[in-house]
Amino acid sequence: MKPWFNLAPTFVLLTLFAAQESSAPAPVPVEQEPHHHLLLKNDYLLVMRVVLQPGERSLYHVHSVDDVAVWLGNSSATQQLPNEPESAPAEQKPGNISLRTLREAPLTHRVHNVGQGLFDVLDVELLQRPEHPSTAVAGPVAGENPSARVYKWTLAPGSVTPMHTHERPYLIIAVTGFQLKMTAPDGQSFTHEIKPGDFHWVSTKVTHTLANAGNGEGQIIEIELK
């Protein structure tokens, strides 16, 4: 029999590897990732603002439902899947959108801000997928997944969208700050001073126009449930 002390190096290495393995952080649900700041939760969706300072990384986290991401700032970021190398940087600018279909195949990843600016994104997690999706559209569709459609309006000062109707609940998001004027078919109107990242959830049928009553270009995103 070999002396017991000949096994010590192997035992130490196995113990070290086991400790390293057990100390590796497990992925967390997206709403528990500390850079994802929860702003709204209801039966239909979660709205989170994701903020990473230059050089910061998120934790590994899991997206398990369809989602929409809306960029609010200029950024350069990578993503990394577990046990995979970091991706090449992706450049983004305000108003860019990303729609993913994840209910059948959840995504686990982490994000690394490799740019000089703030990584600033609204992440909208769509909690329900309709059994009978609406076929009515409110305007030109900028993107869609099985849970929602996205409309993007870029408004020069004084410009107005066509009158359009949201048959389904929707989320309206300000990409840029400007004076937004909303007008109903009866002529009743409301003007709001909005800031980048402001949003409003609407659960009733709405018909309106959107107008830029300010002096600079405005961008609005509408995420309408199907």
State what each model feature region is.
Residues 58-60, 78-79, 100, 106-114, ...:
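Short beta-strand His + acidic residue motifs that chelate non-heme Fe in jelly-roll/DSBH
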Residues 108-156:
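Surface-exposed beta-loop interaction hotspot
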Residues 103-127, 204-226:
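Ligand-binding loop in jelly-roll beta-barrel domains
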Residues 12-29:
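Bacterial Sec-dependent signal peptides at the C-terminal "C-region" and cleavage site
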Residues 83-103, 188-204:
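Short acidic-glycine-tyrosine-enriched beta hairpin
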Residues 1-9:
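Bacterial N-terminal signal peptides that target proteins for export
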Residues 33-59, 64-69, 135-163, 169-172, ...:
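A short glycine-rich, His/Asp/Glu-containing loop-to-beta-strand
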Residues 64-83, 167-186:
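Glycine- and acidic-residue-biased ligand/ion/polar-headgroup-sensing regions
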